[in-house]
């Protein structure tokens, strides 16, 4: 099972702060996103959304999610 954590506005889109996704085997991030509601999957693929896998920011391209992974989706931050 992988834990998905949604921060900022992404939590609003998801409707929950986190969710668990059962994985039978290592799964490409793109395939994992297909398991989610379309609106959420689209928001998570935004060009400025960053991903932290097990606490380390990583690139989405080629990412394979394994059982026990935690993926935190980080929205763009603005301020002044």
Feature annotation, model-predicted:
Residues 1-79:
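Ubiquitin-like/PB1-type beta-grasp interaction modules and other compact soluble beta-rich domains
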């Amino acid at each position: 099972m992988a834990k998905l954590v949604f921060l900022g506005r992404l939590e609003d889109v998801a409707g929950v702060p986190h969710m668990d996704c059962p994985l039978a085997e290592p799964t490409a991030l793109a395939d994992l996103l297909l398991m989610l509601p379309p609106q959420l999957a689209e928001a998570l693929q935004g060009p400025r959304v960053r991903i932290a896998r097990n606490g380390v920011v990583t690139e989405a391209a080629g990412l394979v999610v394994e059982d026990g992974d935690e993926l935190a989706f980080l929205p763009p931050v603005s301020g002044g």
